Amino acid sequence: MRVLIVINQSVEERDNSYWCASNVYDILRRFTCLGELSLCADRYNAKKSHLLMDRELTGVVAKNHVTYINKIRLRMSQQDRAIVSQCVSQSDLVISHGASYDVFRIARNQGKKFMSFVVSCIWDGYWNHGWLGKLVAPYIFLLTRYTVNHSDYVLYVTSDFLQRRYPTQAKYNCGCSNVRITTLDENTLNQRLAFIRKWDGRTMRIVTMAAVDIKYKGQQFVIKAMHQLKQQGRTDIHYYLIGGGSRDYLERLAKEYGLESQLHFLGKIPHDEVFSVLDTMHVYVQPSLQEGLPRSMVEAMSRGLMCIGADTAAIPELIEPQFVTRRRSATDIARLLASVTTEQLITQAHRNFKEAHHYEDTVLDQRRNDFFDKVKNDILK
């Protein structure tokens, strides 16, 4: 079966092969069981590309099966529609990463089966991008909602949130996170508990994994919370940020509040090295204004970290209600950080490590592959 994936991500052509970011590779790898993959993606042409484009696509997408289009913002250009239309004509199944209305219409016009891959809330994404984003959010939200509702198949990354916001009449749909966690080892939990028991009860290392130049990721609210705690005499909380992007805005904010010595930028870290950093932290914070199901939070849970998160998207699906903060609330974050105890860290280590088992590769792959089998059988019957 020939499968076309139209993805709102970037691919780079380098040394006679194609390269993409690890998270994009993971997405594409999971679709290989459906058949022969072709890809429509944005062309990546930035410096230091090896830091981001770190996985070769050979074996997932054949060299002559990558076609470049511009990233889809509001609507596709006429030129890109023509390119996608040509690719669709050679496919049996069209998958749109993000549920693009334009890709949906092209597939429908050619009588091709269409799958929406719903990874985040488009409303939150646009609404949190200033006045222009708020202006177009209702329009793009309704288009996306229509697309998902009328798709032949839908794959969600949440268990509940995106399903409620973007319901579907699809023949088959599945809720399955795109987190990648290998089999969990009880030694990880034991090491976490030993780490907690050595804690002095004051000095705390907290961490967020997200790009540092995207404001809707919310790191600024954690910095403001630290400022509130500093005013209360707490200067022993250190905030570590894992992720690429310009640091200018957050550095200015930290300087304004006199928190430069408490803010630590670790940059982009290879995925296989992230866990060793998480093992040195006490609390993971996910203050986002837009998410699907945050894989970084699940990864933190798999290391037994206590997690705090905003009431955004599927974050409340992952953690207990008392650790969910109001969106944009530095006060809520400060209150929770100030009240952390050793007993709380131990309880949450057990709870979160157990919850992370639901997101192991073997569990999710089985659920996803069962869904893919239904899709294949429906198309090939």
Q: Language-model segments: which ranges?
A:
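Aromatic "clamp/platform" in nucleotide-sugar-dependent glycosyltransferases that forms part
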Residues: 287-289
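Short alpha-helical donor nucleotide-sugar binding micro-motif in glycosyltransferases
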Residues: 88, 268-269, 276-281
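Short hydrophobic beta-strand element within catalytic cores of glycosyltransferases
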Residues: 297, 305-309
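Nucleotide-activated donor-binding/catalytic signature segment of Leloir-type glycosyltransferases, i.e.
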Residues: 251-269
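A short, active-site helix/loop in glycosyltransferases that binds the activated sugar's phosphate group
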Residues: 141-193
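Glycosyltransferase donor-sugar binding loop
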Residues: 209-214, 238-251, 267
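Conserved donor-binding/catalytic core segment of Leloir-type glycosyltransferases
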Residues: 4, 195-217, 223-226
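Conserved acidic donor-binding segment of nucleotide-sugar-dependent glycosyltransferases
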Residues: 322-331, 338-343
